Amino acid sequence: MTAPKSKKSGDNVNAKLGLAIKSGKYTLGYKSTIKALRQGKAKLVIIAGNTPALRKSEIEYYAMLAKCTVHHFQGGNNELGTSCGRLFRVGAVTIMDAGDSDILTAELS
């Protein structure tokens, strides 16, 4: 039995994230997210839902210092990796340039 489809907004985030990955600048992973936040290059950080609390709070702290927006992804790191078009797990995604996507200005809920 398959799980029911997620809400439209979840699909909307996936589509915008996919477009940002294809046309913009981004980094994947915890270490590169922290590095981009410390350098002030990050504009949006997306954190997987099953990221450990300590890592999540550390990313949120650096994002607060960098005045960067943080979005908590509804799915886990497997789903976030799939949304990025990767075959591996991704705990955090940093968008530095959205490219053709309007992910930075859109309401991500």
Curated annotation (Swiss-Prot):
An annotated GO BP: negative regulation of mRNA splicing, via spliceosome
A Pfam family reported for this protein in Swiss-Prot or TrEMBL: Ribosomal_L7Ae
Single GO molecular function: RNA binding
Matches recorded under InterPro entries: Ribosomal_eL30-like, Ribosomal_eL30-like_sf, Ribosomal_eL30_CS, Ribosomal_eL8/eL30/eS12/Gad45
Record keyword Ribonucleoprotein present: yes
Keywords associated with the record: Ribonucleoprotein, Ribosomal protein
SUPFAM superfamilies given in the database record: L30e-like
One GO CC annotation: cytosolic large ribosomal subunit
Protein family per UniProt: Belongs to the eukaryotic ribosomal protein eL30 family.
PANTHER family from the UniProt entry: RIBOSOMAL PROTEIN L30
Protein name: Large ribosomal subunit protein eL30
